[in-house]
Amino acid sequence: MEKVLIWFCGTGTTKQDFLANVEISGFSAIVAIDGIGTAAMLTKTQALAKRANWGGSFVDMSETLGVLYDQVNGYDDRAGVVTLDSLFPLVDYLKTLKEYQLVVGGHSRGAAVGLTEFLAELYHLAVQNQAPGVWANAKTIRLVVVDPVQGQQDADKDTNAFNAILKDKTLAQILAELETKWFGGREVFDTLVYSARYDARSSFAFDSRWYRFITEQMGKQAGPAKRAKLVMAGFRHSAPVSKEDEISALYQGKGVAPIAFLQQLVSFDPNWEQSARLLSQIENGYLDQLAAGAKTDLISQLDKQTSLLSTALPALSAANRCKKRCRRITRKNRNTAGSTAISTGRRRFNASYQVTSD
């Protein structure tokens, strides 16, 4: 069966960056959409329309300033239109397929905004009683939602302001109603939320819409949310998609690593749950050592590369934070699926839900 991938890149990440870091194979079609805060996206949004405010028009006089402005402020309506317009050529291709497996994934703002807006647009069409068209031929739609950090988009805490995303509809409701209206109740959506295990930056918290999905809907509400899973790997926000942030030395000879794990999730590898548990064992072991003050080369590298200093912010080492918090990360249901409370150094999920990594 043909496999098709749609990927929404994170802030400052081009489709070339993504494909260079995460090797994707086995797909008949791949559409990777440039992230906000890239020259590629800026060129497309400028061609569509000028910014609505004077300050935005001023920064667009320089590509460098325009890119930086977008990295700080995130998606605007123009970027939303460009993102969705990028999918039209794919729709023409899907018309040629009788059946296919679809993966829709994204990282950071690409997950929090791009992927979410895509789902909301499908929902918007469904509630207007429009036919599903080519989407009806999807046997499975796997959502791979990687660290959906929204970055305080325009001072908002979530994605409610974006096109077709209704304030009174949760993600669980959107997915459930799509399955009912477009797929006759068939279990189509397979949702995997992939969180970085740790990031020292408090501003890199989950988008509140996805946070509520994890803590209030996942494993509890009927439909796709009941089947959804949370997995965790990596010690930096971009570890699942960036070789630079993966800290690959930690995983050398282990048979698993955050990027390779993402490849498994995207490619429908049936062994992904085994890899999730192994990553949990490996990373929780490092956190135990870090909390205990171990002085090995690997622990020193982990401490250095997870400190705020490594992100060009005032220094606050992961060791100092972990001495207070790592014990809570590692002591409960660390290797098996089940009900747990997870503290990650930047955010905490206090709820009962199914996880496969801790």
Swiss-Prot record:
Highest taxon listed in the record's lineage: Bacteria
Biological process annotations from GO: lipid catabolic process
Location (main, coarse): secreted
UniProt keyword terms in alphabetical order: Hydrolase, Lipid degradation, Lipid metabolism, Secreted
GO MF term set: hydrolase activity
Catalytic activity, EC: 3.1.-.-
Subcellular localization, as worded in the UniProt entry: Secreted
Cellular component GO terms held in the UniProt record: extracellular region
Designated name of the protein: Extracellular phospholipase C
Native source species: Dickeya chrysanthemi (Pectobacterium chrysanthemi)
The encoding gene: plcA
